[in-house]
């Protein structure tokens, strides 16, 4: 295993090209069926150009897929035989399409996690997390797994309130380019490197989003 390294811009651009291709596929598929419409938003480390490779050389990107008011709402979810929630049906639609589209398991893998659909490019060693958000009226609901005790192995998803802690992002936008560079290079990146060196299963790992918010809020305080 190697050291924790910052991802080169060319590698990030290649992974962003893959992400855009996947998103185009999703748009074309669901628009053709007049089922869902959504916009996409790059978030997290890639947005600020502070992506790190782990010890195995892997790195990840994060996208939010914002379902708009134009998506065709499927009614009577709870009246079908399997009594699936609206969130479950939507998550399954997106996951099943991608799982079939990128079915070559020598090249790709798809994982259905608590909140995200994770696309993994095994050869290029990167992953992309796609999180589904109900964008209207307030961009404040995210799909999250909520399996029941009676059927813990059956994936069930619900809409959960999304944290609206945007003050850190507003403050970051107000900073000058020089301040942003200082904050990223001297405060955020060193902490991300420390966390990246930990075991992935360590329950005490601090997320990149938390590091970002904490360091922005503390900057200049």
Regions of interest found by a model, annotated:
Residues 30-34, 80-138:
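Conserved catalytic core of two-metal-ion nucleotidyltransferases
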Residues 13, 17-20, 24-27, 88-95, ...:
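Generic detector of well-ordered alpha-helical segments enriched in charged/polar residues
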Residues 6, 49, 105-109, 213, ...:
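Extracellular secretory-pathway ectodomains and N-terminal mature segments of eukaryotic proteins
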Residues 1-43:
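Helical scaffold of the NTase/Pol beta-like nucleotidyltransferase catalytic core
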Residues 29-61, 65-76:
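Active-site nucleotide-donor binding segment shared across nucleotidyl transfer reactions
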Residues 1-2, 64-70, 132-133:
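Short loop/turn segments at strand-loop or loop-helix junctions that form parts
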Residues 111-221:
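Catalytic cores of NTP-dependent nucleotidyl/adenyl transfer enzymes across multiple folds
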Residues 4-19, 71-87:
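A short, highly charged nucleic-acid-interacting micro-segment common to nuclease
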